[in-house]
Amino acid sequence: MGGEAPEARRLDRAMSFGGAGSIPEEALHLVLGYVDDPRDREAVSLVCRRWHRIDALTRKHVTVPFCYAASPAHLLARFPRLESLAVKGKPRAAMYGLIPEDWGAYARPWVAELAAPLECLKALHLRRMVVTDDDLAALVRARGHMLQELKLDKCSGFSTDALRLVARSCRSLRTLFLEECSIADNGTEWLHDLAVNNPVLETLNFHMTELTVVPADLELLAKKCKSLISLKISDCDFSDLIGFFRMAASLQEFAGGAFIEQGELTKYGNVKFPSRLCSLGLTYMGTNEMPIIFPFSALLKKLDLQYTFLTTEDHCQLIAKCPNLLVLAVRNVIGDRGLGVVADTCKKLQRLRVERGDDDPGLQEEQGGVSQVGLTTVAVGCRELEYIAAYVSDITNGALESIGTFCKNLCDFRLVLLDREERITDLPLDNGVRALLRGCTKLRRFALYLRPGGLSDTGLGYIGQYSGIIQYMLLGNVGETDDGLIRFALGCENLRKLELRSCCFSEQALARAIRSMPSLRYVWVQGYKASKTGHDLMLMARPFWNIEFTPPSSENANRMREDGEPCVDSQAQILAYYSLAGKRSDCPRSVVPLYPA
């Protein structure tokens, strides 16, 4: 939205005359029905008015990457036959407590437009937005009779009262997604009503919420919803789920629950999972409970062990029994030894996530930790990998080179170097990063959060030079001077979204770099050499480019949170983005809109 398509996707305007202009309207409708990539769609719409109109009439899905980038009324008027709409709200940093609660991203302007004109809308996905009970009531009134998919991902502001209204009124729901939402629990009736009124329900997810679960309601859900294939819930003791598992014959994916009384073998001995289950994520599972997975471990395609109490040895034993895994999520307690088992066993693995574990140094020494050794082993052994996200305690250029050499299908790579080790083996990582980017030519998303000295100006220049088709980047503690940032910006021809943290760059250099990146649509920065007013940021001012500055709070300048991170408002932030909606009207006092003024 709001920018030119990359050169390779330009279509000749002359095509609309003579050859392309003679194509029957029905044929164009049919052909465009098979064009889903939004960048291809954008290129089509720029050919001529006729193609622009047909694109508008045939567009079935739109993702708004930032809720303030477009006017709800204008966007929905342009695409009157949308079947699904996704809107993203607060910056990703909100997931890590770096954005104030009152920052904005209110769903109301969007919900208010979802009325009669959108007769085809069946699916709505809101991410990191503030959604109230009134918003959901308005949505039910407007779209409840047609809504088949409602996803509220990491949203806040609503209660189970609104969920009960959704459950009673939206009787065609196939998907209800509420993962990591902050929901006021006013009772469990919503789940009972959902089971009674939605027999076609296929996916229900309220994982990582604090909602109360009544086992009888889950059993009713299994009885009434014969097509239920995916269920992710909040904490509920596994001994209370035996009846549900017995009745949920179609279930293929389950996550949540809890082994509340660990070590009670007799209590959980009767837990039997459905025969079709191939995706599993268990909570609070320890060594003694692990054997309940063994009977069907060879059938598992997805396994999430992030919220278990398993040791390194437990990971090794369990993963050795899972040769068909496509997706694996663990904490770094898996250690290099565990990743060695992954490399030997999981030859089909496509996605690997290694999250940060316990920060207790003693525990890390006992259980291991992930370093260049484990990453290298996985790169060599799991050559189908498309996604790697890992928190590591040590890393080398050689490990990154191995990933570039062997992981040719990699589309998304994210690495965070933890600061618990005093010395890192091999810094800076300039040559390793260059080798990875040159080797992994399919990369579209790239994140690198290092420690001071982790990447020199030369390495930062390599990222720009070899960024290829990368559209999203998160960089932290990279570069040495403003010169490195300018060299980085000379590349990045296809970069659309950039996030920077803990960097040494000046406001002036940031503004110059941002202005010089041709495809950039969104940038968020925290922790840089900020001025009190952000005046140098005006160097990047241009039409349709909103600039918001959050000055540091003098009161909290040196205050730290309990986890050792700076307070939310102790460091200046920049948010700049293309917008066809103009200046937003709901900025909190902590945010200063610089442009448009």
UniProtKB/Swiss-Prot annotation:
Record InterPro entries: COI1_F-box, F-box-like_dom_sf, Leu-rich_rpt_Cys-con_subtyp, LRR_dom_sf, Transp_inhibit
Highest taxon of the lineage: Eukaryota
F-box domain boundaries: 22-64
Gene Ontology CC terms, in alphabetical order: SCF ubiquitin ligase complex
Keywords on record: Jasmonic acid signaling pathway, Plant defense, Ubl conjugation pathway
Span of the signal peptide: none
Keyword hit for Coiled coil: no
Tissues expressing the protein: Expressed in roots, shoots, leaf sheaths and leaf blades.
Binding site for jasmonate: R92, R353, Y391, R414, R501
A Gene Ontology BP annotation from the UniProt entry: defense response
Subunit details: Interacts with TIFY10C/JAZ8 in a coronatine-dependent manner. Interacts with TIFY3/JAZ1, TIFY6A/JAZ3, TIFY6B/JAZ4, TIFY10A/JAZ6, TIFY10B/JAZ7, TIFY11A/JAZ9, TIFY11B/JAZ10, TIFY11C/JAZ11 and TIFY11D/JAZ12 in a coronatine-dependent manner.
Note: Plants silencing COI1A and COI1B show increased plant height and seed length, are hypersensitive to gibberellin, and display reduced sensitivity to inhibition of seedling growth by jasmonate.
Purpose: Involved in jasmonate (JA) signaling. Required for jasmonate signaling in plant defense responses. Can complement Arabidopsis coi1-1 mutant and restore jasmonate signaling. Component of SCF(COI1) E3 ubiquitin ligase complexes, which may mediate the ubiquitination and subsequent proteasomal degradation of target proteins, including TIFY/JAZ family.
The protein's name in its UniProt record: Coronatine-insensitive protein homolog 1b
Record organism: Oryza sativa subsp. japonica (Rice)
Primary gene name: COI1B
